[in-house]
Amino acid sequence: AKLQEYKEKEESDTETSQLVQKELEQTNMYLGKTDVFGEGITIKLKDFTDEEGNIQSITAEDLLVIVDYLKSAGAEAISINEQRIVNTSEIVYVGNSIVYINQQRILSPYTIKAIGNQTYLESILLGNGGYVDELKKIGFDVDIERSNKISIPKYQKELAHKYIQ
């Protein structure tokens, strides 16, 4: 379909150039190379101290599960504490409430932003017996807000390729 579109636009170098530029902008957006803005949701999570005085921490696994749910609900861009999540992002829990995302130390409270259809994003997390329900039952404070003006920063590192030539 794209090839046919290029051929049809071939008559005008300006139109072809504009089409290629638009494709490049979209590709950079999906790769996380540009700041993005749009409607979506913000999720706030934080560690808590239980009745026995033990700190209960949000783990990397918790964050990964939420990111996976958001992706499955059609999130077009996601960040955690202003760290853009891309296909090469690592979310690693090292203990004592310390999580590394994109090799940056991130501490609780966590703010997860997702751009996409607010209804889908919110409903996948809030469904009866959903992951947010489970976190709340344990005692975690979880807040989800809808917004028409979510901003997610670009991925700050170079996208490195070891094997692609």
Model regions: which residues?
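Juxtamembrane "stalk/linker" segments
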Residues: 1-45
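Membrane-proximal structural modules of membrane-associated proteins and complexes
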Residues: 36, 40, 50-164
